[in-house]
A protein has these predicted regions:
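PEST-like low-complexity, intrinsically disordered acidic/proline/serine-rich tracts
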Residues: 1-181
Length: 181
C-alpha cells in the first residue's frame, strides 16, 4: 500500500513539488476552478471556485476529496469533504470518511503558507492543525515524476487499529518538546 496516496490532509506534508493553475470559463474568463498537481503520488486536485455545493453525503469519497474555495482578501480558503478514510500520520493515527478539512493559502512574495485545520468526529477530539511553507521555484515546464519503491516502513498488525489510551499518547507534545515551547 505504500505507493497508494495519502489522503489530502497528509498529501502536502514533507518535501514535495506542486503546481497550481487557473481553469477559466472560455466565454466569460471567470475562474471556475484551480487545478493542483501534487508531485508526491502524482495526484491531481480540483478546487472549485464557481460556488457549486458539495455533493451529498453518500457520494464517492477519494483520497483528494471534493474541494471548494473562496477568496477572503489575499487568503484562499478551501473546504474539502468526501475524503477517503486513511491515516493522518505514518505512525497510524487513523481518519474516518467524516473528515473535513479547511485550508488557508497565503502568499508572501515567493513564499506560500499552507495551513490546514482537520476535523474528524470519529477519531479526533480536537482539530488537527498543521502548516507548511513553500518556496516558489521557477522551473518552467519541468516537474518530477513520483518514483515509488515498496519498502516496509511501519510494520503493523492489519487486524488492529492503532490507538493510545487517554493520557498515554507519546506524540501529544512532541513538537512542543522538540522546539522548547
Amino acid at each position: 500500500h505504500q505507493c497508494q496516496p495519502y489522503n489530502v490532509a497528509h498529501s502536502y506534508r514533507g518535501p514535495l513539488q506542486f503546481r497550481i493553475w487557473e481553469d477559466k470559463d472560455p466565454a466569460t474568463q471567470e475562474i471556475v476552478a484551480y487545478r493542483v498537481y501534487i508531485g508526491t503520488y502524482m495526484q491531481y486536485r480540483t478546487i472549485w471556485m464557481d460556488g457549486r455545493p458539495h455533493p451529498p453525503e453518500h457520494a464517492p469519497h477519494t483520497f483528494i476529496g471534493f474541494s471548494t474555495g473562496r477568496w477572503f482578501g489575499e487568503t484562499l480558503t478551501v473546504t474539502t469533504t468526501h475524503i477517503k478514510k486513511e491515516f493522518y500520520r505514518r505512525s497510524g493515527i487513523p481518519s474516518s470518511d467524516l473528515t473535513t478539512m479547511v485550508e488557508h493559502y497565503i502568499r508572501h512574495g515567493n513564499l506560500l503558507s499552507h495551513v490546514i485545520i482537520v476535523t474528524d468526529p470519529v477519531y479526533l477530539t480536537e482539530p488537527y492543525v498543521n502548516s507548511q511553507e513553500f518556496v516558489l521555484m521557477d522551473r518552467g515546464n519541468q516537474n518530477w515524476l513520483y518514483n515509488c519503491e515498496y519498502k516496509m516502513e511501519v510494520p503493523m498488525d492489519q487486524t488492529k487499529v492503532p490507538h493510545f489510551l487517554p493520557g498515554a499518547n507519546p506524540f501529544q507534545d512532541e513538537w512542543a518538546k522538540k522546539f522548547g515551547l
